[in-house]
Amino acid sequence: SHKMAELAPRDVVARCIFKEMQQDKADHIWLDATQVEGVEKMFPMIADTCKEYGIDISKEMIPIAPAAHYMMGGVRTDADGHTNIDGLYAVGETACTGLQGANRLASNSLLEGRTALAIRQDSEHLPLDLGQQWKNDGLRPAQDDDTDLQTQRLQQIMSTYLGIRRDKEGMTQALKEIDKLARHYDGCSATQYPMLDLRARITVAGLVTRSALEREESRGAHYRSDFPETKDEWKRHSIISKATATTL
């Protein structure tokens, strides 16, 4: 138990929920909000979603389980969303501005959203043809019909091996499977969004896994059962490059 109970940091609460689910061999635990006066007005979207499944959150407990929620990290940018590519901006969860650390603080995304709006208003004059044209010359046709299946497979890999609890053995296995997916689609033409999206997901998954393997400690949402303690030498951001696939 934690001294702050349900007000403990999100990573702590998620690990506690995960532990209970494992002990009970269950796919969820129960959240009791029936004693919270006006809970439907406080959380209208949750209340409406639960109603669709026949649950009245003012009278019944809610089945819950940890899930991916917010990206802490992303494309390296400055405070104004500039990347190292001319004309390419990254904002919100796509970007790593330095605002987020190893844990997500409530409402920080609102600050990033306000900044993104200001950037958008200031960048309307920028030309749209700064980037290079995508070339399919010499590439073999891609089989786009399996992108949904492979996307689900990638999600399963990341959830299993890089979810709430991580270790070297699991992440090494994840990297093998991610690299296998990457080789499968290497050299394929990709003109449709589902294929472009899948290839980008594979790239990001590989970079996240390599970075997590390199960080031999636990900090915030990055929890390693083989390195459960926080280490001062890792009190910094990790920057990983696709070109080198090594952390800097």
Regions found by a protein language model. Name each.
Residues 2-6, 17-20, 70, 76-90, ...:
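Glycine- and aromatic-enriched mobile tails/lids
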Residues 46-89:
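FAD/FMN-dependent oxidoreductases across multiple families
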Residues 29, 62-64, 94, 220:
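Long, contiguous hydrophobic alpha-helical segments, chiefly transmembrane helices and signal peptides
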Residues 1-62, 118-124, 132, 144-151:
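An anion/pyrophosphate-binding glycine-rich loop and adjacent beta-alpha core
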